[in-house]
């Protein structure tokens, strides 16, 4: 999401110390997203230092570490989000969908029912499942309309 948001938010790109791609991003497909990397949980305890660096580099990007920051959300193209009740990161996807909704952004959320085979990123890890094919077909349709 950061790379896509940087196309429309120069301050974000500057804080990250990168030049945004000129390749236009019309929509995003986000499957079982690890959106929140600074929470006090298994992800947030170790990941931030690898993602954001230390010292001045970290300080410049600090305000953008949470993807539901309004400057990031409002800079995103339409988003198609996929999760499931068995996805260990379902709560991240639902929180991100809530932020998109609160900021009036166009998105579609597909949250699959509780089913042991529909685990984290099931549509990537097991693309031959009926639900995986359904996910990909709906995502393509969403992209075509973006």
Predicted regions, residues:
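Alpha/beta-hydrolase superfamily serine-hydrolase fold, recognizing
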Residues: 1-146
């Amino acid at each position: 999401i950061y790379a896509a948001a940087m196309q429309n938010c120069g301050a974000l790109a500057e804080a990250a110390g990168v030049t945004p791609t000129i390749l236009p991003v019309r929509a995003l497909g986000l499957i079982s997203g690890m959106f929140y990397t600074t929470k006090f949980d298994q992800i947030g305890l170790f990941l931030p230092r690898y993602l954001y660096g230390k010292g001045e580099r970290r300080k410049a990007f600090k305000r953008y570490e949470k993807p539901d920051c309004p400057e990031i959300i409002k800079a995103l193209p339409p988003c198609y989000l996929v999760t499931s009740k068995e996805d260990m990161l379902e709560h991240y996807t639902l929180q991100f969908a809530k932020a998109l909704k609160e900021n009036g952004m166009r998105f579609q959320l597909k949250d699959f029912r509780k089913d042991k085979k529909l685990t984290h990123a099931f549509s990537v890890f097991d693309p031959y499942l009926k639900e995986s094919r359904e996910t990909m077909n709906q995502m393509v349709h969403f992209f075509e309309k973006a």
